[in-house]
Regions:
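N-terminal beta1-alpha1 cap of cysteine-dependent amidohydrolase-like domains
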Residues: 2-251, 256-257, 267-336
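Catalytic His-Asp charge-relay segment
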Residues: 259-263
Length: 336
């Protein structure tokens, strides 16, 4: 069992040999210069798109599972409200330590447009943040970004503004799939950044057990990377998965030169969503999900932006308590 082998390693070596664990868990004060042990992560809200069996009393929302997913690894969350102005985005961005694009439902393109025009109610705002992240990193600041499912697809749309970037796939109702990892995965930051042995154990779980929950009608074909050099220049494909019809799609990515990661699957659902029988909740499924959360939050600790407490308090997600809806999501945070 991977956990037992990890304990053996921990007994024969010091936890100081795993700096991401040692430095982030002992206390609230940084034990390394430049390490931020109070990260604040912005989550881009989604426009109010009605789902089957529930409607949202608000202009946008976040599924609460994403909030708890980040909080469990030691971060706090600030909503980046999709209906707010670019000036508000510019205010929040230098105060946050990382950004997450969630899964859900939203349009990438302006309806009926003959050429690809980013939808003003979602994709244009997301790609604005994407460009800010790239610019910050280009200027020498470490600024991480993560995209899940819809957010994963958005990462591709932002890198390659073409209709054909996102394809149709047979991924509903939700299902689980194993990963076929590429050679890039074995040397990727995401599977070596916490500890090499731990990352290898998680890769083994993901490639042999159905721990990755998928719920999608769209995705990115591996052939799209061959069709559009913008994508292959920006991202390394870490894994390939297959939909219900056997069609391959990209499962995980890591940017080549930026701290940007994405998954077509939903690691947060294993921990916090219980309304679909297909969601895996067994031990190793939880191990995988907690690994992903801990990895991303560990990366946000490398960003040293400071959100002054008097400004942070009214922005924190706690100001919008979760609402139990017992539908597609267990709970949501809604914003008026």
């Amino acid at each position: 069992m991977w956990f037992l082998s990890f304990l053996v390693v921990a007994q024969s070596t010091s936890l100081r040999d795993f700096p991401e664990f040692y430095n982030s868990e002992i206390n609230h004060k940084p034990v390394q210069a430049g390490l931020n042990n109070a990260p604040v992560i912005g989550i881009l809200t989604l426009p109010n798109v009605p789902y089957e069996n529930f409607t949202i009393n608000g202009t946008s929302y976040i599924a609460s599972s994403y909030v708890k997913y980040l909080e469990m690894a030691g971060a706090r969350v600030v909503p980046i409200r999709i209906d707010h102005s670019y000036a508000e985005f510019d205010y929040l961005f230098p105060r946050l330590n990382g950004i997450l694009f969630t899964g859900g439902s939203a349009n990438f393109w302006v309806n009926s447009s003959k050429v690809p025009i980013l939808s003003p109610d979602y994709a244009a705002k997301g790609c604005y943040l994407y460009d800010l992240v790239k610019k910050a990193n280009d200027q020498g600041q470490f600024y991480p970004l993560w995209g899940t499912c819809l957010g994963f697809e958005l990462l591709h749309v932002c890198a390659n503004n073409q209709f054909a970037t996102v394809g149709n796939f047979n991924g509903e109702p939700s299902y689980t799939q194993v990963h076929q990892f590429t050679s890039a995965a074995t040397v990727s930051k995401i599977f070596t950044g916490l500890s090499l042995q731990f990352g290898q154990q998680v890769m083994s779980i993901m490639s042999n057990q159905n721990v990755s929950l998928l719920s999608h009608t769209h995705g990115i074909s591996p052939s799209t990377y061959q069709q559009f050099p913008n994508l292959s220049e920006m991202y390394n494909i870490l894994s390939i998965m297959h939909d219900k019809s056997g069609s391959p799609f990209v499962g995980m990515i890591e940017a080549r030169n930026y701290p940007i990661w994405g998954t077509q699957f939903h690691p947060e659902k294993n921990l916090y969503e219980w309304n679909q029988n297909s969601i895996p909740h067994f031990y190793n499924a939880v191990v995988m999900s907690t690994y992903m959360s801990n990895f991303f939050v560990s990366q946000t600790r490398k960003n040293t932006n400071v959100f002054p407490q008097n400004e942070l308090t009214p922005q924190l997600i706690y100001n919008w308590p979760p609402i139990f809806i017992d539908s597609y999501f267990e709970t949501i945070n809604a914003f008026n």
